[in-house]
C-alpha cells in the first residue's frame, strides 16, 4: 500500500478561446506528435465551419454531438471457466465522454475529404443531428450489451 496518500483527481483545463473543457479534451485527443498548436488550429477551423454550416453556436453543436454519441453501457471481455464472455457494464460520465470523443475522431478520420477540420465539422454536425458513423458505433455497442444481458451477473 502506498505511504504517500491518495492522488488528487485531475480535472481537464479549459481552452483559451471557448473556455470549455470539452474543447480541450477534443484538442488533447486529436493531438499527434506533441503538435498542440496544430491540434488547436484544426479544432478552431472545424468550429468555424460548423458556425458557417449551421449558423448556430458551434459549442452547442459540439455538446449535442457528444451527448448523442456518449454510451450508457458497454461490454467488457471477462474470462469465466475457460470461455470469454462479453459482460455488459455501465459507463460513468467522464469515461463516456472520453469514449464519445474517441469515436467522433475515429469516424472523422475515416471520412473521405479534404482536411481534418472539414471532416471533423461534418461528423460533429451529423452526430448532433443523430446520424453519422459515431452514432452507429454507439448503437452497435448498445446492441451488443443488450444481446449479452444474460452475462450481466458475471460483473
Swiss-Prot record:
Q: Which GO terms describe its molecular function?
A: rRNA binding; structural constituent of ribosome
Q: List where in the cell it is found.
A: Plastid, Chloroplast
Its chief place of residence is plastid
Q: Name one GO cellular component term.
A: small ribosomal subunit
UniProt entry tagged with the keyword Transferase: no
In the UniProt record, does the keyword Nucleus occur? no
Database matches in CDD domains: uS7_Chloroplast
Q: Which UniProt keywords apply?
A: Chloroplast, Plastid, Ribonucleoprotein, Ribosomal protein, RNA-binding, rRNA-binding
Q: Which family does it belong to?
A: Belongs to the universal ribosomal protein uS7 family.
> What biological function has been recorded for the protein in this entry?
One of the primary rRNA binding proteins, it binds directly to 16S rRNA where it nucleates assembly of the head domain of the 30S subunit.
| Summary of subunit composition and partner proteins | Part of the 30S ribosomal subunit.
HAMAP family found in the cross-reference section: Ribosomal_uS7_B
Under what name is this protein listed? Small ribosomal subunit protein uS7c
Native source organism of the sequence: Stewartia pseudocamellia (Japanese stewartia)
- The gene it comes from is rps7
